[in-house]
Swiss-Prot record:
InterPro entries: AAA+_ATPase, DNA_recomb/repair_RecA, DNA_recomb/repair_RecA_CS, P-loop_NTPase, RecA-like_C, RecA-like_N, RecA_ATP-bd, RecA_C_sf
A GO cellular component entry from the record: cytosol
Record flagged with keyword Transit peptide: no
Species per Swiss-Prot/TrEMBL record: Xanthomonas axonopodis pv. citri (strain 306)
Lineage, top ranks: Bacteria, Pseudomonadati, Pseudomonadota, Gammaproteobacteria, Lysobacterales
Region (Disordered): 323-344
PROSITE patterns from the UniProt entry: RECA_1, RECA_2, RECA_3
UniProt keywords, alphabetically: ATP-binding, Cytoplasm, DNA damage, DNA recombination, DNA repair, DNA-binding, Nucleotide-binding, SOS response
Protein's UniProt name: Protein RecA
GO terms for MF: ATP binding; ATP hydrolysis activity; ATP-dependent DNA damage sensor activity; damaged DNA binding; single-stranded DNA binding
Function statement: Can catalyze the hydrolysis of ATP in the presence of single-stranded DNA, the ATP-dependent uptake of single-stranded DNA by duplex DNA, and the ATP-dependent hybridization of homologous single-stranded DNAs. It interacts with LexA causing its activation and leading to its autocatalytic cleavage.
Signal peptide, first to last residue: none
Cellular location(s): Cytoplasm
Amino acid sequence: MDENKKRALSAALSQIEKQFGKGSVMRMGDRVIEAVEVIPTGSLMLDIALGIGGLPKGRVVEIYGPESSGKTTLTLQAIAECQKNGGTAAFIDAEHALDPIYAAKLGVNVDDLLLSQPDTGEQALEIADMLVRSGSVDIVVVDSVAALTPKAEIEGEMGDQLPGLQARLMSQALRKLTGNIKRSNTLVVFINQLRMKIGVMMPGQSPEVTTGGNALKFYASVRLDIRRIGAIKKGDEIIGNQTKIKVVKNKLAPPFKQVVTEILYGEGISREGELIDMGVEAKLVDKAGAWYSYGDERIGQGKDNARTYLRDNSQVATRLEAELREKFQPAEAPREAGDDEDKE
């Protein structure tokens, strides 16, 4: 760059800093690139699949899937992990369906959990924005986008046609929220539902679509698709679900990784079940017939007994987890690639 251009650029940068404050514009080389702070999900498999060890702070995350697939369970486990590390969590319950007894079973400290049950979508998103701007909340969960009903719809008559109202509300809210989320380093998780597009018959095209328009797809740094794929039985009794979680979008690590984990009723994601499955895959746990062995020790006949053994012997489980983390530990998060999609 010639001297005249350098002087012109220097003058422009000085003017920008004077008008908008120091750090408004900076060279990438002058900026300290730090590893992204994360909140663990409560699932070791998913933390590794995300590539950064959990859900990224200072970002928007979308978790979507069919009904009863484990969306709220996953967010409550992330809240529990956040609280274990001394963080503050907020849950905006637009569906008015949070069960505090179930949340407590998953390890959530319900006495310290900030809960809001707003009347309208505008109120829910305004509360989320105020909590984010306070800079004192580590994770805010909005459950769910589908339940964020615009005020005009609530005040209108049943059957009124108000096309695109919720999509416009989400687009406007996310434009306002994203800057505040980055500045306050808060993780904001939106739970979303699936709907079916009528008339989609093209091969290769999915008829499924998430609610609330396209804005959330663009603004989210991570999108997780969670689905129930089978039942877990103990004898004839169903005790949980086999669940597949796919990382559909990831701006901080390679996407499209997927994991199959177990969600047990009244317990949440089975940590011990994951340790056994990952241990077998990593050849740290031997499986001979129905027997599972770790080191020189037999830990159980059948997965359910092995799971119980690890639950009762926490030192063994902790040692196995440490070995698995060492083997699968994700590398430090790379710099984020520029997202060239236009935000709408």
